[in-house]
Amino acid sequence: MAAKDVKFGSEARAKMLRGVNILADAVKVTLGPKGRNVVLDKSFGAPSITKDGVSVAREIELEDKFENMGAQMVKEVASKANDVAGDGTTTATLLAQSIVNEGLKAVAAGMNPMDLKRGIDQAVIKAVKELKKLSVPCSDSKAITQVGTISANADETVGSLISEAMDKVGNDGVITVEEGTGLEDELDVVKGMQFDRGYLSPYFINKPETGNIELENPYILMVDKKISNIRDILSLLESVAKSGKPLLIIAEDLEGEALATLVVNSMRGIVKIAAVKAPGFGDRRKAMLQDISILTFLYNSDVISEELAMDLDKTTLEDLGQAKGVVITKDHTIIVGSGKKEIFKQILIRQQLIESTSDYDKEKLNERLAKLSGGVAVLKVGAATEVEMKEKKARVEDALHATRAAVEEGVVAGGGVALVRVAEKISRLKGQNEDQNVGIRVAVRSMEAPLRQIVANSGEEPSVVTNNVKDGVGNYGYNAATDQYGDMIKFGILDPTKVTRSALQYAASVAGLMITTECMVTDSPKEDKSSDMPSPSAGGMGGMGGMGGMM
């Protein structure tokens, strides 16, 4: 077992605090409308430029192991805030730094660290309740646009696109962010269900100008096994041909004689037909096929399955689903349709979401729910260079997370004003003893830190602006972008309640633990023994010289 390096008391806390401050100082320069960028060196490729707090925090590793422990604990605050709310990482880091700095001063003055932590926790619990009272619902497009704009660093185009996307696919709809090919940001909305499976044969293409397959009001056959024998579906094909409607086959695979026969029939115009592989694998494939069946009016039966003792060769038109339309490219299939059973299915999936503990399962359930709810929207980010593209994409993703959080729990006045108002309301809170009262005051003072940093980053005097804001009431605050005082809601400066709440809770949680630290243990640095070894060049040269003499 490797030897350990152990530090105690004020020496340990001083090292830890230095690490906290190095990381937080790097992150907090990005806060507010006049916050600056941070350039991150990469081991390969061009450096990346970001204004995202968690991206900066993740890059920081310090050489001193004790300092690094402090930095990593604050990094955990940013990561947790990012995972839960998707934004507010800089605010969370700044709050943690402020609580740790104020708290360690109190510890150095002789306060009981455990009572300090209890006081901080008590203040945060009360502050969260007050935040919820200040919160107002965020349901209209204007508020969603404002939240997106603020989170995207005052980019109104991004805010408008996010609002439009949520309007088209619903609050539960899937909205993804991708790198575009042009200079302008674009929104592409896909109604219905899309999955990553393209056509099995290019000979099915009926729109050569686009290279796609388009079917109007098609029948849909869903099978959870391979189809290789054409006899299994021959009678069904005859019935479909008589109906005059197209047919889409979704199966585990379609091969050999069956695929060849379908291609020939399609090319001769006997029946309009297309085939794709079923999406997903295992249990997820079954779930997705069931979702498609709901989307396509499939009432009389479920997916054709051997588990249900259903024979493919006995399938009739009544066993098929129907859709309004289908578009198939070489990579994707889009099915547009809606069934009356959708609402019931959505309720079932929502229940599974509540019960699920796996992040992966929750992500996939959310995708399924979105496809039944309205569709998929793709935000394509435009930029002139790859470096700008990466920076902008990160901002758009932050803005998207912020708007989702706003819809979920509402919004409060932005620019650090909500925390200042909450601090005023809990300033008279009392603990069980004086040390707890000091902890409460530490938390209250720290809640001013985001406003102070926004002002500092805009080049103004933090104390003057903070006092002016504290003299006001309600949503009265400071607009750092225009250097004006007024109603933050009317200025369109909003913060999602969930983001502010998460930042405060996670900052206090980790900072409280750091304040109560008395000992730090890490591996001792390994000594470099290479300097003690004899230089190989001396002996080698001597040998060479000797050999030269012999020759």
From Swiss-Prot:
Disulfide-bond pairs as recorded: none
One Pfam family here: Cpn60_TCP1
Bias (Gly residues) ranges: 539-551
TM segment ranges: none
UniProt-listed Enzyme Commission number(s): 5.6.1.7
GO cellular component: cytoplasm
Family (UniProt): Belongs to the chaperonin (HSP60) family.
Task of the protein: Together with its co-chaperonin GroES, plays an essential role in assisting protein folding. The GroEL-GroES system forms a nano-cage that allows encapsulation of the non-native substrate proteins and provides a physical environment optimized to promote and accelerate protein folding.
Self-association and partners: Forms a cylinder of 14 subunits composed of two heptameric rings stacked back-to-back. Interacts with the co-chaperonin GroES.
Name of the protein this chain belongs to: Chaperonin GroEL
Gene: groEL
